[in-house]
Structures are given as C-alpha cells and as structure tokens.
C-alpha cells in the first residue's frame, strides 16, 4: 500500500471498524499527530477508541480527498448515535452528524504525520452540551 490515497482509505476503514490495533498496519510507530489527532500513535488510538465508546456505530465517509506527493487532504463526514459518555455528556441516544478535515503525510506506505480538525461545536450542540438558546439554527454538515 504505497499510494497515499490507498493508505488514507484503509485508515478510515479501520476507524469504521473500531479496530484501533490495526492502525499499526497503516501508521508509523513514531507517528506525529497534531490538533485533534493527539500527539502520537498511542494518543490517536485512544482518541478513536473514546469516540467509538461514545458513538459505537460511528461511520466516517470521505467526501473529498486531494493528494499531492506524500500529502492527502480530506474532508470527512461522520455520523453515529450518542450512546456513551462524551466530554462529560452522558449518552443521549441522539443521532449526530459532523465533519472533520484531516491532512496526512505518508512515507513508505505508512502515515507518519496527521493533523485533524473536527467541528466539535456542531457535535457538542447535537448531543445537548449547549443550552437551546446558544444553539445555532444551521449546521455546516451536508
């Protein structure tokens, strides 16, 4: 799996499976993470596991992926059901849909660097973290 887009696709398949141990197949052991991805491979696995505990049916769908050399930029939509505690909010049974932007760098068929920005405001709004008067009327999710 040398192609950066193929590595990216496999990464999201693993996220959808919730099989964080399989990340070792597509991520370098010394992976560097930024923003929501955590600082390293261990933190990336923990982040994905935490999301999967709170949203067991979480699904990622790649909307756009643009590759240049060893970099792939993606716009990803996520959806799932809030069934477990997330950020101090107990499971609500609510369906959520939010988006994220990821930038990955691939070397020798493995992700060596990942940056992730997630629309946490929309997610928190959907699980009831904000009082109704502070909730926006529209979401940027499609």
Predicted regions mapped to residue ranges:
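C-terminal and inter-domain tail/linker signature
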Residues: 1-142
